[in-house]
Every structure is written in C-alpha cells, then in structure tokens.
Regions:
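C-terminal ends of transmembrane helices
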Residues: 20-32, 78-90, 179-181, 255-270, ...
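Hydrophobic transmembrane alpha-helices of secondary-active transporters
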Residues: 17, 44-51, 64-92, 251-260, ...
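Membrane-embedded hairpin module used as a gating/binding unit in multi-pass transport
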Residues: 17-18, 169-262
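Flexible hinge motifs at transmembrane-helix junctions and intramembrane kinks/re-entrant loops
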Residues: 24-40, 57, 61, 230-251, ...
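Structural signature of hydrophobic alpha-helical transmembrane segments
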Residues: 2-16, 62-75, 125-132, 240-252, ...
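Alpha-helical membrane segments and immediately flanking helix-loop junctions
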Residues: 112, 116-156, 160, 167, ...
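Juxtamembrane and boundary regions of transmembrane helices in multi-pass small-molecule transporters
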Residues: 115-122, 165-202, 318-331, 376-395
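Entry/N-cap segments of selected transmembrane alpha helices
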Residues: 84-114, 219-222, 290-320
Length: 395
C-alpha cells in the first residue's frame, strides 16, 4: 500500500514529530543532556516507523517536499539578515582560519575514503561515494556527482552517494550537540563568552527589540529578500557553478540589512526575523527527517559501512582535537565544533540545528552563527566541487 501525503499533510506530520521531539526532550534527561535537536528526535522515530512499514510491506510513504524547500529558504534568509558588516569585520581572521580548516577537512575526507577503499579492494571511485561528496556536500552534491561517477562505470553510484548522505545527516545531527556540550563543560567555557562579537549582538538586540505588531513587517522583509534573491541566484547560475537555492536570498538579505543600517532608510526587525528563522529551521528539519529513507542504508555492504564509520570517526577527531584548538579553545570554538559536525557530515541546516540545541542550553554564539552558514553555504560547496573534481580526475 502506498500512502501519498500532499504538502499540507507533510507539514502537519513534521509539526507532530517536532512536538513529539520537544516532549521527549523535556521528559528524557539523556536527550536534554546531550543537546539532541528536537526535530531529530521525533523525526528519527517517525523515520524508523516508516522504514519498518516499508520493509514488512505494510505501507510505503511518499511526501511532498515543496514546503520543506520554502522553510529552508526562509531560514537562510533570516541568517543573511544577521550579516552585520561590523560583526563580519571583527571576525575576518576567524573566517579565513575556519575556511582553511574546512578545506583541510574536505581533503582528509577524500583521502580517508580513497585510502580505505584501496585497503578493502574496492574501486577508489566507490570510496569517493563516501567522501566529501555526501559528507560536506550532502544530498545536493550527492545527486550532482552520483551520475558523474556512474558515467565512469561505478554502478549505483547515485544510490550509494545518497545513502551515505543520509547516514551522514543522521550521525551529524547526533554527535554535534554532545561534542559541543562536552567541550563547554570540560573546559568551563561559559566564562569565555564575553567578546566583541557578543557585545555587538547585545547592542543589536537593544536596537531591534521584539514587538508583536512588527512580525508582519518581518515576514514582508523576509519575502522581499527572497524575491530579490531569485535575481541574484539567476546571475550566479550563469557562472556555470552550482549554488544552493538559498544563496541568492542570503545575499539579498545581507545587502538589505547593511543598506538599512548605514542609511537609516528602514528598520530591519531582527528580533522578529530571528524568531521566524528559528521556526522555519525547526519545520525544515522536521520535514527533512520524516522523509529519510532508512532502508537505503540497509542495502549498503559491510565495506561501505566501514567507510562511513571512518568518516564519522574522522569528523569527531578533526573537530574535537584540531578545530577546537585552532579556533581558540573558547565557547565560540565549542559551538563551531557542534556546527561543523552538522555540515561536515550532513548539511548546513543540521549544523544550525546542532548549534541552536547547544546555545538554547547555554548562551548564543554570534561568531558561530555567522561563520557556519557563511562558509557552509557559500564557500564549502564551491571548494568541495573543485576538490572532488581534482580527485576524480586524479583517480
């Protein structure tokens, strides 16, 4: 039996799993302690149920992901509005260092994948199916490079890449929060949160306090940025490169924010925009989790499971040992670790959800909230594509 849910029903189910996740997180200390995002909790439970239904032949669920994309774009537009040039200037050095770390991570993921594939007597290109293509790249890059590998006689490359991206999505969501929390508590990092970035955030919040009657204006500003962003997206695609669909909206939002800040022509309602962005993120992640096809992981052979386990181990060691120390061993660095686990093995929205889960328990990190989406959405995909292309041609 095939059960087809339209976009309204899909959204309703996402809300139900989100509410379930919030309820379980409040009731189960373990989930709260390790900062597991609520959409991941409820979404995984639902995904396991649909997997059981599929395997036993009871039912196969099909979802309409139209609103998932809308929520994702709304969220990243809200992130774009956070791009205050004063904050970005103060974090210039951190941006360059973090970008360098991401490049190193991409290279290490592919070296690990290719090296292990050779040890397991697999075609190195099969190893690439578990490297940075699905890890840093996520489902989008997996869908783009899977057919390329199939053209190189790697049978089922798209399925392997997609399944690996699903694997990374799950584990990236599960390990990010606990790692960030452990670093914060182990090194008593809450006393390192007072810095220039945070003072700018406090100043910004004072200028943009929340008012109920301003939420409509905030929605209008988000929609306007998304509309203008489509023009930017069209221009970017003419370069021949592949960009996430939300990058144009992010750029438009950042432009609107700084023009308004500089000229005073209008007030950007940041408090309300941040609230709406948080809601959009929860809804997006809820819909992303309920549409996971867990049975695709069961079809992976043991060597591929080993390859994927190695990627999880790599991201843990890299973020916990290398990234945390290089990024300053402070609270911001711990939140960056949590976020990197999200987009380093899954997707930028998972990174944001990881950081939100940790920050909800402690305090916000404006540096992490700017660096992760900026690098994860704008630079990482571009650099990843270059590195992947280099490795494929080398092999």
């Amino acid at each position: 039996m095939k059960i087809q849910l339209d976009m309204y029903q899909t959204l309703a189910v996402a809300v139900l799993v989100l509410l379930l996740g919030n309820y379980l997180k409040k009731k189960i200390y373990f989930l709260q302690k390790f900062c597991i995002p609520a959409p991941v909790i409820g979404g995984l439970i639902f995904a396991i149920m649909t997997c059981i239904c599929y395997v036993t032949g009871i039912a196969e669920f099909s979802f309409d992901d139209t609103l998932r994309e809308v929520c994702m774009v709304f969220f990243f537009t809200s992130v774009g509005f956070q791009a205050n040039l004063k904050v970005l200037k103060s974090g210039g050095k951190s941006l360059i260092v973090f970008l360098g770390l991401v490049i190193v991570l991409i290279i290490l993921q592919n070296l690990t994948a290719v090296g292990l594939a050779k040890l397991l007597n697999l075609n190195p290109l099969i190893g690439m199916c578990t490297g940075s293509i699905p890890m840093v790249g996520g489902h989008g890059t997996a869908g783009a490079f899977g057919p390329v590998l199939e053209d190189l006689n790697i049978k089922g490359a798209t399925t392997i890449c997609t399944a690996a991206a699903t694997f990374g999505l799950i584990f990236g969501s599960l390990i990010g929060g606990p790692l960030g929390k452990r670093l914060i508590e182990k090194h008593s990092l809450l006393n390192t949160t007072a810095n220039d970035d945070d003072s700018l955030l406090v100043e910004d919040e004072k200028k943009h306090e929340r008012h109920t009657n301003m939420y409509a204006d905030a929605v209008f500003q988000l929609i306007l940025a998304i509309g203008v962003g489509t023009i930017f997206t069209i221009l970017l695609t003419k370069t021949g490169l592949t960009f996430p669909i939300y990058i144009g909206a992010m750029l438009a939002a950042a432009l609107m924010r700084n023009i308004c800040e500089y000229t005073g022509i209008a007030t950007i309602h940041m408090g309300e925009i941040n609230d709406l962005g948080g809601i959009s993120l929860s809804l997006f992640l809820g819909m992303a989790m309920i549409t996971l096809r867990l049975w695709e992981l069961a079809s992976l052979a043991l060597p591929l499971i080993i390859l994927l386990a190695a990627q999880v181990l790599l991201i843990i060691i890299f973020t916990y040992v290398i990234e945390f120390n290089i990024m300053g061993r402070d609270y911001d660095a711990a939140i960056l670790v949590s976020g990197t686990c999200g987009f380093g093995t899954g997707a930028t929205p998972n990174a944001m959800a990881n950081m939100q889960a940790v920050c909800d328990q402690y305090v916000p990190s404006i540096k992490a909230y700017l660096l992760i989406p900026l690098v994860g959405s704008l630079f990482a995909d571009f650099l990843n594509s270059l590195v992947i292309t280099f490795f494929i041609n080398l092999l």
